[in-house]
Structures are given as C-alpha cells and as structure tokens.
C-alpha cells in the first residue's frame, strides 16, 4: 500500500509553495551552557573615525557590524553606511562594504529571522530627512534599496525618523511571532534645544517582510530618543530609552534611563518608569540634550530572560568606560556589571550569537572609543557570559540560584 502511495506523495510535495518559516518555528534559542565555559574577551578595531554603531548576527551566524559617517556640520555623509562581516564568529573580518551613500546611518539594523533578510535604514542627511529602506539577501554581502518600502505615520500624523536606534528584532513568541520591530523617534521638527521637550520615542514594525512599516503609539514620556527594544520569553517587549529633556519641575533622577513595556507586539507602550540603576551615559553631563545611546540584547537562551545593557559608566561629565550590565529576570533587577572599555568612549551596540553557528556562545559589543577621544574609532569586543560573571555586583538584586558560576 505504501509503495503505491509514495509516488503520489512525493509528486504532491514537489508543488508545495516555499515560504519562510515564522521565527517562532525556527530554532533561534539554545542552552545557557553555550555562553559559559572559560571566561574570554577579545578586542578588534573595525573602523577608523566616524560614529554610529549597530551590530547584528545574520541567520547563518555571520556577524555584521555597521558604521556611519558623521559630518561635523550635520551635512550629508559622503561615505554613508558601511559594514564589515565576520563568517567565523568574530575572529576575522572582511573588508568594508557600502550599504548606501551618501547618507546618514539610521541605526535599527534588523534581521528577519523568517527569511534571513537584513534591513538597514539610511537617511538623506541629519534628520528630519528623506529616508528609505535597504535590504541584504545574502547575509550582508550586498545591499539594495527596497523600492516599494513605505514608513507610515503614527496616529498623530507624524512620520518618525530612524536616526538613531539600537538594532531591531524579530518577535519570536506569541501571536505576533515573525513581526519585525525596531525603535524610532520623532524629532518635533528638528534637533534643537527648543524642541527637546516635545520629542518622543516610538517604534516601527512590519508584518509583511519589511515592505510596509507601521508606526507604533508614542513612548509614554516626552523628551525621549535613541531607544532599544528586546522581547522576553513571554512575548512582552521591553523598551529602554535615552532621555533628552524632562518636564519642568521634574523630580526624577536625571542620570537614569526610561523604560516601558508592550504586551501587543510593540503597538502600544505602557508602565513607563525610571530604571533604578541603569545610567543614561555620564552621570554629571545632565542637562538639555543629555544622556547617551545604549546597547541592549536578550541572550537567546530557552526559558531564560537574560538581558544585557551597555552604556558609559562615568561619575563625571565625560563619556567614558563603556560597561555592560546584566539582568537575569527580564529587567526586574540588574545585579551585575563589568567594564569592557577603559577610557574615552560613547555609543555602543550589543548582540548575541545564534545557536548552531560559528557565533554561538559569543556576545558582541560594537563601541565608539579611543585612547585620546571618545569618537576616535570603532571597536568590537566579543566575550561570553562567563567573562561577565567575573564582574562586580551592583547591589540591585541577587544572582539567581539556577546560574552555574
């Protein structure tokens, strides 16, 4: 009987359409042990001068570090967005590849875990500005404009700008699994001190593979910008935001970060609060236009919500000493930190390796830094969780009992 049915079954299978698997059906999360082992840290200089780091890990495990040119007068970036790739988990790095030019780097580089496509978001100049979407279908080797891509306004009629945000994510859990989501912001007409109190963070999301990008409801607090998002294992999305200005008469600690949550896949944000411990850059550089861009990632560990956050850890007014904080309970507490870069440094971006690839078990931090100036060069640190566990305890909560130290 089986021998008679087999040809028909095979014939039918040949004509089945091929669609990318939803991210939730893909094996994107592994075991805690892959991030453990012997404590290890390596440093690589990837870029000279310029700014704006974003780092992602392609579906095949290729690490893609992106960088953008910045002109002193906020003019057009002649060299645009460039990337360097590593196919061996970060040991060696290929040459510079141009994503788009001339342009500014909008950040929010996003890997679609269903199709493997990677999206980047150039802007014609310092925003507000014309913007477009670029895509790579070969893990960052080549890039092309998505001709039919559209970014829709929010309910207030405001089309957000892309510059600058931490890398985006693909949602893996719940009814919105497969959705692409990245932070974005509205500049309130221009980046000047008078507009700071009206600016707000937001997010854009795509349910059609990166062609149509809808804008979420605004972040609950004004004066925000340069956000980062991470999805927890229960499907909630955590939003961590830089602060540029607070309402008049505010009694908030001006050195700390805003955070909020989404339970609908990034459509709305609620429960905004000041994080108890995470610094918003140098603690004494507070004032209009203060704060600092930060990195954020959830380690792809099954059933665990280990979040990493990176920013300057300076008690002075100088941006320096990029440090990584660790939460083992999905941003409830941050009991551990370790400095990665000693000296002048600023913006940083975080990501983590994928199970079953050369990147597995590694954590990646791309930062601005140098010996004499914080914007001197672009450096890539790769390390593991064991290395972070040798850091110092912060007093904000305790290390979990399930953690094998």
Regions found by a protein language model. Name each.
Residues 6-7, 43:
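Generic N-terminal leader/processing signal
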Residues 1-5:
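N-terminal secretory signal peptides that target proteins for export/translocation
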Residues 24-405:
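Asp-box/BNR beta-propeller blade signature and adjacent active/binding-site loops
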């Amino acid at each position: 009987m089986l021998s008679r049915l087999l040809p028909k079954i095979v014939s039918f299978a040949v004509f089945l359409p091929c669609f990318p698997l939803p991210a939730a059906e893909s094996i994107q999360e592994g075991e805690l042990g892959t991030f453990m082992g012997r404590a290890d840290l390596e440093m690589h200089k990837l870029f000279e001068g310029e700014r704006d780091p974003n780092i992602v890990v392609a579906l095949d495990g290729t690490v893609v570090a992106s960088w953008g040119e910045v002109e002193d007068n906020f003019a057009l970036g002649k060299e645009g967005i460039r990337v360097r790739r590593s196919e061996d988990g970060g040991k060696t790095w290929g040459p510079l590849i141009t994503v788009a030019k001339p342009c500014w780097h909008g950040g929010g580089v996003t890997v679609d875990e269903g199709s493997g496509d990677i999206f980047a978001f150039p802007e014609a100049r310092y925003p507000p500005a014309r913007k477009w979407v670029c895509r790579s279908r070969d893990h960052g080797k080549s890039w092309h404009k998505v001709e039919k891509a559209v970014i829709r306004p929010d309910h207030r009629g405001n089309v957000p700008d892309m510059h600058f945000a931490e890398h985006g994510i693909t949602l893996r859990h719940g009814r919105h699994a497969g959705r692409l989501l990245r932070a974005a912001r509205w500049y309130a007409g221009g980046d000047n001190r008078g507009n700071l109190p009206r600016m707000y963070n937001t997010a854009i999301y795509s349910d059609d593979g990166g062609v149509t990008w809808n804008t979420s409801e605004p972040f609950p607090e004004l004066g925000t910008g340069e956000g980062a998002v991470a999805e927890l294992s229960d499907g909630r999305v955590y939003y961590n935001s830089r602060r540029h200005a607070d309402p008049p008469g505010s009694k908030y600690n001006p050195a700390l970060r805003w955070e909020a949550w989404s339970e609908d896949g990034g459509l709305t944000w609620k429960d905004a609060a000041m994080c108890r411990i995470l610094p918003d850059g140098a603690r004494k550089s507070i004032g209009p236009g203060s704060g600092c861009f930060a990195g954020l990632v959830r380690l792809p560990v099954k059933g665990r919500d280990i979040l990493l956050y990176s920013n300057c850890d300076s008690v002075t007014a100088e941006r320096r000493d990029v440090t990584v904080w660790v939460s083992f309970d999905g941003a409830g507490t941050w009991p551990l930190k370790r400095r990665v870069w000693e000296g002048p440094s600023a913006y940083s971006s975080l990501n983590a390796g994928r199970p079953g690839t050369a990147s597995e078990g590694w954590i990646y931090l791309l930062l601005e830094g140098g010996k004499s100036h914080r914007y001197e060069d672009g450096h890539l640190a790769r390390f593991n969780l064991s290395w972070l566990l040798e850091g110092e305890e912060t007093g904000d909560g305790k290390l979990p009992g399930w953690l094998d130290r």
